[in-house]
Every structure is written in structure tokens, then in C-alpha cells.
Amino acid sequence: PHPDALAFEVKEANGDHIGILYMDFHPRESKRSGAWMNSYRKQSALGKKVSPVITNVCNFTKPAGEDVPALLSFDEAQTLFHEFGHALHGLLSQCTYNKVSGTSVPRDFVELPSQIMENWASDPEVMKIYARHYQTGEAIPQSLIDKLEASGHFNQGFVTTEFMAAALLDMAYHTRTTTDLVNPNEFEKTTLDKIGLIPEIMVRYRSPYFQHIFAGGYYYAYTWAEVLDADAFEAFKETGNIFNPEKAKSFRENILAKGGSEDAMTLYKRFRGQEPSIEPLLKRKGLK
């Protein structure tokens, strides 16, 4: 690997080999922007056991000097947790066929393992563990945590509405029953009028530059993933311990290990004991 990259052997608590994880944190000329997870080798168990080789790739600024570590913004910390969730999905897979192992799941389910990790990133109990002053080691003060939480609630009514309007517009395009040509602007106006979108709130993407409409009507999956991750994290909170080992074991066995080998909602209900509720997401957004 590149000298900047770190390689880890991931093991079970008893020492058994799980897989290899590469962490490539910093930008360089040959890398594109953004952050992502890749599977260099997917897990499988057809005839012989094949362990996964996974990478997390980010573009975090390098340390400014020998005595200064790489300092992450809160958004970057969330990105790190998010991509690590995808990595866990790939590493902890226990499927027979690599075609359905790891992150090879329906598109509206693939973000659950990543987005649920962001809940720990923003939890005050966890932040006081990792969000520390790089010189003094002092944990982030509660006043800053409160401000971060308040900023997360800001304008959520507007943001949620524009996202949902775009999702409904996308779905309208993909549920048309005729092949007649339509004027995109007229179709958009008719659709948004039907759902009652007020003029003061514009759909997140106008039709002429709404690239997602060419990807199979999946734009709703972004919001649906939020419903799933908020409800799944609620399962941990309900135990009174967000690190509850039994609940974590259930999430691993029923979600992470299964990949796309079974129906996604069946797996979710097996973990959660019920269908996902929208209430935890509304509460997290400050809408209820």
C-alpha cells in the first residue's frame, strides 16, 4: 500500500482472523475527492472460506507539523464513523456467495450500517471520549455539544421538505405508465402542485439537473436510510446503554453478517423486533 495508508488485521475477540482493513486517510494527486469504502476482496464461503479485504478512503488534511496531529472537523469525524460502518458491513459478512456478501444489499438498505455509526459520533457520551483538545487532552465541553445539537435542528423542516419533494418527484418520473414525451418543467410543476409544495420551498433538484432521476427511482433511499438508522439506534438507547453488547451482537448477526442473503426488512425486524418507526428520526431532527 501507499506509505500514507495503514493496514490492520481484524480479529475476533478469541483471536480468529476476520479480514484486513486498509485506512487511507489523506489526499494526494492520484486520489479523487470525497470518502468511500471499497472491497478489494469480498467475503465468501463457497467450498472454502475467503476473508474480506476492505479499505476506507478519505481526504482528511495531513498534520500541519511534527507536533500537530491531523485535526478533524466534526463533519469529518462523522465521515470517519460513517465509512467505518460500511467497512464493518464488509468485514463482518458471513455469507456463502460473494455476490450477496457485505454491502451487496438493496440500495435503500446499504446506508443503514454506515449512518447508524454517525449516531455514536454525535452522542455526547462518545464525543467526550474522542473529541479532545489536542494539546491539553481536555474533553469537549458540554456547551459546545449543546451548540452542535442545536445546529443539527436548524432549518430541518425546510431541509426535510425539499428532500421529500425531490424524492416524490423522482418517484413520479419512475411510476409513469406511458412512454409519451413530457415537458420536464410542466411535469415537475404538476407533480409538486399535487403534493402541495408551497412556492417558498423549492424542490432540492430541478428536473433539468436532477441527475438522480436517471438512476432508477432510488432518491427516496437517502431519507429512508435516516428512518432506519434513527430507529435502529433507538433500539440501543432503549436498553439504557448505547454500547449494549447484546444489542450490538444482534445487529452484527442480523444485519452486518447477512449481507443481501435475505430480505432486508425481514432482517431488520429480526434485529429490531418490529418494523421501523419514523418517530426517532422526527425527534432527532427536532420536528417532534
Regions found by a protein language model. Give the residues of each.
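C-terminal, non-catalytic "cap/extension" segments appended to globular domains
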Residues: 1-4, 9, 13, 17-20, ...
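Short, hydrophobic/aliphatic alpha-helical segments
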Residues: 53-56, 95, 258-260
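A generic, residue-level signal for flexible/boundary positions that often mark functional hotspots
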Residues: 54, 66-68, 94, 204, ...
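Conserved helix-loop functional segments at active or binding sites
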Residues: 62, 90-97
